[in-house]
């Protein structure tokens, strides 16, 4: 039986731990036959140990999305990793960051612009940066997928990260216009809350007890609202949604947002 992604070469960014959504995307993609290239930032030795837990070995490249030299050399380094003459079929952007001043119990109005702009650069602008760097080495019919969290309402403790996700949604629509010139699609997956390392830290009080309590209420309310329920400890449904977008089965879908949240975004209570 062939896998959904057999023979496809896919770059996955954003693995930090084995609780990262990106880790589960990489795992499911490999289970479906994909050949991966991974990117990581900063703690590469630690990330390498984490990625060694995947079903198959994959090259790990350093990528700081704020570093213009890293971005300028990315296509060449990827080509070296996958072999001359080969191109990518998919790119996964699972990168997000906002300084603590822009999240948690810190008042929304008190976040310094320098911190907010850094968060928006990493969480939203970098989606366009990566697309620009990699589109020239992508095959027609390819797919770029970014990770979203529904920013249509003000979320407790998320503050400026919610604003960054709103920016990401707009960036995606423009990336879709540019990617279309290469015959490539661009979409986001809006996931429900997943207990990643960062989320667990917030619930544990890393951004203050009040913020932790608010996020815990958000998680509990999500499962109650979702018509089919929501398991915040299981990232596999989200990973499968991403892999569906990376496959050939949604060839006419681009510039869009696909929800993988148990349907909670459709329900008021």
From Swiss-Prot:
Chain positions of site May act as an intermediate that passes the hydride ion from NADH to the substrate: 149
Gene from which the chain derives: inhA
Record-annotated site: Transition state stabilizer: 158
Positions contributing to substrate binding: 158
Protein source organism: Mycobacterium tuberculosis (strain ATCC 25618 / H37Rv)
Record-linked SUPFAM superfamilies: NAD(P)-binding Rossmann-fold domains
GO biological process: fatty acid elongation; mycolic acid biosynthetic process; response to antibiotic
Keywords tagged on the record: Antibiotic resistance, Fatty acid biosynthesis, Fatty acid metabolism, Lipid biosynthesis, Lipid metabolism, NAD, Oxidoreductase, Phosphoprotein
Pathway the protein acts in: Lipid metabolism; mycolic acid biosynthesis
Catalytic activity reported: a 2,3-saturated acyl-[ACP] + NAD(+) = a (2E)-enoyl-[ACP] + NADH + H(+); a 2,3-saturated acyl-CoA + NAD(+) = a (2E)-enoyl-CoA + NADH + H(+); (2E)-octenoyl-[ACP] + NADH + H(+) = octanoyl-[ACP] + NAD(+); (2E)-octenoyl-CoA + NADH + H(+) = octanoyl-CoA + NAD(+)
Other comments on record: Was identified as a high-confidence drug target. Many isoniazid- and ethionamide-resistant clinical isolates contain mutations within the inhA locus. Resistance to isoniazid and ethionamide can be conferred by the single substitution of alanine for serine 94; this drug resistance seems to be directly related to a perturbation in the hydrogen-bonding network that decreases the binding of NADH and the INH-NAD adduct.
Effect on the protein of changing residue 266 to D/E: Severely impairs catalytic activity, as a consequence of a reduced binding affinity to NADH. These single point mutations are lethal to M.tuberculosis
Matching CDD domains: ENR_SDR
A GO cellular component annotation in the UniProt record: peptidoglycan-based cell wall
Consequence of changing residue 158 to A: 1500-fold decrease in catalytic activity while no effect on lipid substrate affinity
Name of the protein this chain belongs to: Enoyl-[acyl-carrier-protein] reductase [NADH]
Post-translational modification: Is phosphorylated on Thr-266 in vivo. In vitro, can be phosphorylated by multiple Ser/Thr protein kinases (STPK) such as PknA, PknB, PknE, PknH and PknL. Phosphorylation decreases enzymatic activity.
Residue ranges of coiled coil: none
Documented effect of changing residue 158 to F: 24-fold decrease in catalytic activity while no effect on lipid substrate affinity
Top-level taxon: Bacteria
Activity regulation (UniProt): InhA activity is controlled via phosphorylation: phosphorylation on Thr-266 decreases InhA activity (5-fold reduction) and likely negatively regulates biosynthesis of mycolic acids and growth of the bacterium. The antitubercular pro-drug isoniazid (INH) is oxidatively activated by the catalase-peroxidase KatG and then covalently binds NAD to form an adduct that inhibits the activity of InhA. The inhibitory adduct is the isonicotinic-acyl-NADH where the isonicotinic-acyl group replaces the 4S (and not the 4R) hydrogen of NADH.
List of residues binding NAD(+): 20-21, 64-65, 95-96, 165, 194
UniProt-reported outcome of changing residue 94 to A: Confers INH and ETH resistance. The mutant is 17 times more resistant to inhibition by the INH-NAD adduct
Function comment: Enoyl-ACP reductase of the type II fatty acid syntase (FAS-II) system, which is involved in the biosynthesis of mycolic acids, a major component of mycobacterial cell walls. Catalyzes the NADH-dependent reduction of the double bond of 2-trans-enoyl-[acyl-carrier protein], an essential step in the fatty acid elongation cycle of the FAS-II pathway. Shows preference for long-chain fatty acyl thioester substrates (>C16), and can also use 2-trans-enoyl-CoAs as alternative substrates.
């Amino acid at each position: 039986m062939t896998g959904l992604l057999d023979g496809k070469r896919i770059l996955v960014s954003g693995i930090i731990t084995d609780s990262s959504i990106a880790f589960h995307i990489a795992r499911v993609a490999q289970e479906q036959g994909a050949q991966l290239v991974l990117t990581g930032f900063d703690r590469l030795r630690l990330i390498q140990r984490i990625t060694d837990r995947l079903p198959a070995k994959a090259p790990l490249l350093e990528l700081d999305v704020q570093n213009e030299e890293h971005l300028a050399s990315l296509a060449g380094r990827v080509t070296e990793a996958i072999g001359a003459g080969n191109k990518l079929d998919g790119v996964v952007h699972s990168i997000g960051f906002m300084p603590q001043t822009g999240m948690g119990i810190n008042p929304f109005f008190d976040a310094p612009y320098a911190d907010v702009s850094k968060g928006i650069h990493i969480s939203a602008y970098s989606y366009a940066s990566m697309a620009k760097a990699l589109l020239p080495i992508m095959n027609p019919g390819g797919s770029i997928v970014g990770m979203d969290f529904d920013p249509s309402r003000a979320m407790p403790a998320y503050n400026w990260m919610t604003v960054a996700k709103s920016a990401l949604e707009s960036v995606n629509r423009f990336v879709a216009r540019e990617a279309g010139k290469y015959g490539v699609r661009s979409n986001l997956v809006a996931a429900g809350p997943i207990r990643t390392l960062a989320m667990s830290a917030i619930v544990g009080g890393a951004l203050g007890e009040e913020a932790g309590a608010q996020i815990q209420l958000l998680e509990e309310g999500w499962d109650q609202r979702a018509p089919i329920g929501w398991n915040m400890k299981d990232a596999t449904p989200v990973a499968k949604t991403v892999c569906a977008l990376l496959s050939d089965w949604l060839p006419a879908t681009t510039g869009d947002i696909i929800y993988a949240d148990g349907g909670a975004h459709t329900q008021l209570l």
